[in-house]
Amino acid sequence: MALPAEAARLDGGWQEVYSALQWIQFTMAMLSVIGSSSIIAYAIFQNAVRSPEVRPLFYLSLSDLFLGMCWLAGALLYSTPTSKQDLICYNLQATGQIFYVASFLYTVNYTWHLYVDLKMKYNQNLLRMSPQVVDYVSCIGRIATISSSLIPFLLMVPVFCLGNSSNCYQNFSQKHGCLLMHTEIAMPTNEPQTLSGSVCRAMHFYGIGVFLVSFLISFIAILVILSQARGLYKRFVNSTGFLGDQQWAMIKMVEQRVVFYPIAFFCCWAPAVLLGILKLTISTNSKIYMALLILQALTAASQGLLNCIVYGWTQHVFLSLKRNACRDVDTQTPLLRSQKKFYASTLPASTPDAEGSTSTLL
């Protein structure tokens, strides 16, 4: 897709690298847009956008959709240079970074909502939840959702205002076109140190800092929530007498999502974080840097796709467990899991078929 006129601006080996990055970025961004759009469409058609369980995932998918569109636009603009490409690329990349940070925060927000949902299900089986507690949790959730949109925008205001006023976009697309190397806020060219150059340099490191710090905070928050959720899940296992099989299927689905969404988050952004750190420490012409560029193009643009896969797979597992649980309704009086374990323990060891029929779902 790259035009011959662009060859002059790229060093020999880097021209091939950026051409490969363009195709990788285009493909992964397209898949991410399709994946996030499918979750959004599913939530809308099921009329579940306002559901407390679906709303955080809807906003996370919306952020992934806009992020994928930014990646897609960058890949397309790489092969179709315009007269104001430097200005467009600079602001497109800054816009993309808003959605990077928003995606981090919405992932934390969704993981927290999953944990709260798990905790409320646990408490509801032990004691009745007061309406005040439910309203309080709902209010906190709305504040977190609004903050996840507002904070990234406010963080990037200096990049838009100071960067454009200081002409930091000059020669911005000279090397990499409009491919979104998300940690690469424009550095000034070889020129005497001026106030404008100092501002651009500050914006460069500010952009990297915002990305790395927001990722670190989000990652720590997710680890804390994950550890709390695992402890709560163990309490569920030890209190199986309170749960029927259909309830247990729901608990298992929520617990899986608490685990797999953070894993998808880390897989998507770990190469990009390493790339941002390397840009501050070593030359950007090293082979490690080149490898991370390719790995980043494969992972960072794919969060919408991975989130869609996680949601679809956990939903499939939930429906499968629920169907298995419903078989008791057609054959016998439904049993609690503790009752099934008791009856299973009283069966002789020589009856594997009967034992298999009374085993727990896990």
Model-derived features: positions:
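Extracellular N-terminal segment of 7TM GPCRs
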Residues: 1-38
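Extracellular TM2-ECL1-early TM3 structural module of rhodopsin-like
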Residues: 17-22, 53, 58-127, 131-132
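Extracellular/lumenal N-termini and interhelical loops of multi-pass eukaryotic membrane proteins
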Residues: 1-14, 156, 160-199
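Class A (rhodopsin-like) GPCR signature focused on the TM5-ICL3 interface and adjacent 7TM helical core
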Residues: 107-119, 158-167, 205-242, 259-279, ...
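Seventh transmembrane helix
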Residues: 256-277, 289-348
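Helix-to-loop junction signature of class
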Residues: 2-4, 22-25, 66-83, 96, ...
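Fourth transmembrane helix
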Residues: 102-183
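Intracellular signaling interfaces of 7-transmembrane GPCRs
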Residues: 47-52, 116-141, 223-256, 312-341
